[in-house]
A protein has these predicted regions:
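A short glycine/small-residue-enriched secondary-structure motif
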Residues: 42-47, 172-176
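A short, Lys/Arg-rich alpha-helix, primarily the initiator
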Residues: 1-33, 68
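Conserved hydrophobic/aromatic packing and binding residues within compact polymer-binding modules
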Residues: 26, 37-41, 51-54, 81
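DNA major-groove recognition helix of helix-turn-helix/homeodomain DNA-binding modules
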Residues: 1-2, 45, 64-80
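The alpha-helix within a helix-turn-helix
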Residues: 30, 41, 71
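Conserved binding/catalytic microenvironments
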Residues: 115-122, 126-406
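Compositionally biased, long intrinsically disordered regions
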Residues: 20, 72-127
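Recognition helix of helix-turn-helix/homeodomain-like DNA-binding domains
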Residues: 45-62
């Protein structure tokens, strides 16, 4: 049998939407589209166990955030949702204190055309974007990328209403959203989409004279090159970012360390450590940091140096630097802890410390599975392969643990 051609015409599905019966909605949608819980979860940013729990009524859908993800991810026609969706000023996670009731009312009025776009409205949007950047550290990109895409669309719709300095500020906000969306696409190993968003971010940054964002976009393209094992391209993009006009010292430091990582990938240890040292000197003297570089600090630089050590097979210093970096990461940085924890396991495995490699792997395996796919998850698979090739029994233990979560 072929899937139902227009599922939203089906009376059962329309009834479920009208009643906000989320378990029935998910079950009926899957039945009509012949979809698995995993496929549905990927569309709405939920793991398969979460979909199962909702469908079996073991978990209630109570947050605005999850409702929005279901509506947006499944393409629920807004006429079925009605005013409940229109009342939302911007799609948002439920984050206390991010948008006050006054700001929410203001954003609703701006969206409906009853109030002119003003500085206070843009301040509220800035706060929302900043909060979601931090939330992504904890819940991962898969969970919120559709949500942030919806936010971007709302902000883009305001461009035609902005005048004078506000117009430039809207373009800057669009550049920040595009950079964040590019980062999340890259985090999900979707390079073509990431490059498209990076290009849009760079164009908007140039249009609005936003040197920090223009440099950041080039730095993130360097990061993408690094993730594809293109060391030479990583170096060149990092150096281009570092020379961008009107970029702050903090942004230059990020660019210089990217060049250093590219040199490490190419096996050029002297150039790698020289640029990494220079990046730390620059950031130490920096007085202003753009809001999207909130994670900057000694812990982050130690972790980056550990990454360079890994490329150069300096296992002892890699272990030391990664341990230092991880010790300074807040618990909310789940994605970063999963990634750098898996790199620490790699360093231990490279040094022949199989037991330590297994312990490091198991300490982050849950976060790697839940929010660290594909990068941290694939790194743990590489660690298992290294251990198995060395005939260490810990390799089979790790492999079995990974299979259990696959």
């Amino acid at each position: 049998m072929e899937p139902e051609p227009n599922v939203w015409a089906h009376p059962e599905l329309r009834t479920a939407v009208a009643a906000e019966d989320w378990p029935a909605l998910l079950k009926t949608w899957r039945k009509l589209t012949r979809s698995s819980q995993s496929k549905l979860g990927a569309l709405v940013g939920l793991a398969q166990p979460d979909i199962s729990a909702i469908e079996n009524r073991r978990r209630e859908v109570t947050s605005v955030e999850v409702r929005q993800r279901i509506i947006h991810g499944l393409g629920v026609p807004l006429e079925l949702v009605g005013a409940r969706y229109e009342e939302l000023p911007l799609p948002s996670l439920v984050l206390p204190g991010v948008v006050s009731e006054t700001d929410a009312e203001r954003l609703i009025a701006v969206k409906q055309g009853g109030l002119r776009l003003d500085t206070a409205s843009l301040d509220a949007m800035d706060a929302l974007l900043a909060a979601h950047r931090r939330a992504e550290d904890t819940v991962g990109s898969r969970t919120i990328i559709s949500l942030v895409t919806a936010q971007f669309e709302e902000v883009a719709a305001l461009y035609g209403r902005a005048r004078g300095p506000l117009a430039d500020r809207v373009v800057k906000l669009l550049a920040e959203y595009a950079q964040f969306l590019a980062w999340m696409a890259q985090d999900q190993d979707n390079a073509p989409v990431a490059l498209g968003w990076f290009d849009r971010s760079y164009d908007w940054a140039l249009e609005s004279g936003y040197g920090d964002m223009a440099a950041t976009t080039l730095s993130m393209k360097a990061h993408l090159a690094w993730s594809q094992d293109k060391g030479r391209r990583c170096v060149r993009l990092g150096e281009a970012a570092a020379s961008t006009a009107e970029a702050s010292e903090a942004t230059r430091a990020m660019a210089v360390q990217m060049a250093g990582r590219g040199h490490a990938l190419e096996g050029n240890s002297a150039d790698a450590y020289r640029r990494l040292d220079e990046a730390q000197q620059i950031i130490a003297a920096a007085s202003d940091t753009p809001p999207w570089l909130y994670f900057y600090g000694e812990s982050w630089f130690a972790a980056q140096r550990g990454m360079a050590d890994l490329h150069l097979k300096e296992w002892s210093s890699a272990t030391e630097n990664l341990l230092t970096g991880l010790a300074g990461f807040a618990p909310s940085f789940r994605r970063d802890r999963a990634w750098y924890g898996s790199c620490l396991a790699h360093a231990y495995a490279g040094a022949g410390e199989a037991e330590a490699a297994l312990d490091a792997s198991l300490s982050v395996i849950t976060d790697a599975s839940e929010i660290g796919r594909p990068h941290a998850w694939e790194e743990l698979h590489r660690v298992a392969g290294m251990l198995i090739r060395r005939r260490a029994p810990e390799g089979r233990v790790l492999c079995d643990a990974l299979v259990a979560l696959d």
